[in-house]
Amino acid sequence: MKQQLLERFLSYVSFNTQSDGRSQNVPSTHSQFVFAQHLRQELVSLGFEDVQLSDKGYLTATVPANVEGVACIGFIAHLDTAPDYSGENVSPQIIENYNGEDIQLGLEEVLSPKQFSSLNQYIGQTLITTDGSSLLGGDDKAGIAEIISALHHLLTHPEIPHGKIRLCFTPDEEIGRGADHFDVESFGAQWAYTIDGGQVGELEYENFNAATAVVTAMGNNCHPGTAYGVMVNAQTIAARFHAKMPLKDTPEHSRDYDGFFHLLGMEGVTEKATLTYIIRDFDLELFEQRKRWLTELVEKYNAELSIGQLTIDIQDSYLNMKQQVLPHPHIIDIAKQAMQNLAIEPIIKPIRGGTDGSRLSYMGLPCPNLFTGGHNFHGKHEYVCVESMVKATETIVEIAKLTAQHK
């Protein structure tokens, strides 16, 4: 299984599937559809049933049940890689029997246990790293490789009891659109798991409540030589507004269950300037308080202005899946037991972000998140451990077996 996983993963990361938040297309990049077509052909050749690729880039397939009366479950991963860092010409490095020392990434970069202490747990194992010029794509091509490998194992080992199993590979998860065209009804699963986490043992069913706020400052432009008493610089208004934001309530000062405001982007000219913030909190009431506080700050600042004005638009992005998953405790219990059966210690922690599963849970498909075995996603220091990928694959198989016992 290890060699098969490795070969499958290396094949997948050769596809540059970065999504593009500026695009209105679905998928946002054609390369995701090309990758999905490749996977469709592979699934058909491996004997999966009902292999379908929608015009929106959603790839689904089925492993038929070999026992009756068992819940249909699903496994989900995403096709795209993050637009945050280059995904072109990915050149993986395979480090066998890792010795615990610095790993050279090309000529200029280093992956060091001094900076990334997680490396210390993988001494003696096989790592896949970047060459320093791109991200790796383990998020989420490791998840895709693990799902296909696990479900193919079930197809070729009919002695393992399991119910009907569905898979779906979604586009544009990294830009928050992965669930936009997901057809929960036709998917037909009672619950599902995204395979989109990090280190071995991660089991996540809490995520941020998330919103985006766009604060717009309006000014008045004129020739700077005749600007006295006339010009209103929207950029100055925006900068002074941001100076009123709490300095410590930001991502770089938060961890665990802390929420934050994050200035994601700012742009403007004299006439108009915009500040784009993301708002995050695990607690729903605190989340609502944050949105109210920011709105009130805009109102107070407007009252101080003699000229110029701010407006604010806040849109919710996704909510904490915890409220939708906890009423179905068997979903978590089965995943925990599957790991324990494989001598894996479950690591239950909140997702300081979101997954397709967070939105799908509110669409009627409870969907916690499981580990892939990767680290340092979205950048040049990304790496995955092949032995961890094997464990993720085995966990998927074990979940299928345990679900067959849960009637």
UniProtKB/Swiss-Prot annotation:
Write out the catalytic residues in the record: 80, 173
Q: Which UniProt keywords apply?
A: Aminopeptidase, Cytoplasm, Hydrolase, Metal-binding, Metalloprotease, Protease, Zinc
User: What name is this protein filed under?
Assistant: Peptidase T
* Species assigned in the record: Shewanella halifaxensis (strain HAW-EB4)
Entry's HAMAP family?
Answer: Aminopeptidase_M20
Q: Mind giving the lineage of the organism this protein is from? A: Bacteria, Pseudomonadati, Pseudomonadota, Gammaproteobacteria, Alteromonadales
Localisation per UniProt entry: Cytoplasm
Which cysteines in this chain are paired by disulphide bridges? Answer: none
The cofactor named in the record is:
Zn(2+)
Q: CDD domains given for it? A: M20_peptT
**Per UniProt, where does Zn(2+) 1 bind?**
78, 139, 196
Query: Mind telling me which InterPro entries this protein's record contains?
Result: ArgE/DapE_CS (IPR001261), Bact_exopeptidase_dim_dom (IPR036264), Peptidase_M20 (IPR002933), Peptidase_M20_dimer (IPR011650), Peptidase_M20B (IPR010161)
Q: Which reaction does it catalyse?
A: Release of the N-terminal residue from a tripeptide
Output the Pfam families linked to this UniProt entry: M20_dimer (PF07687), Peptidase_M20 (PF01546)
Q: What is its main location?
A: cytoplasm
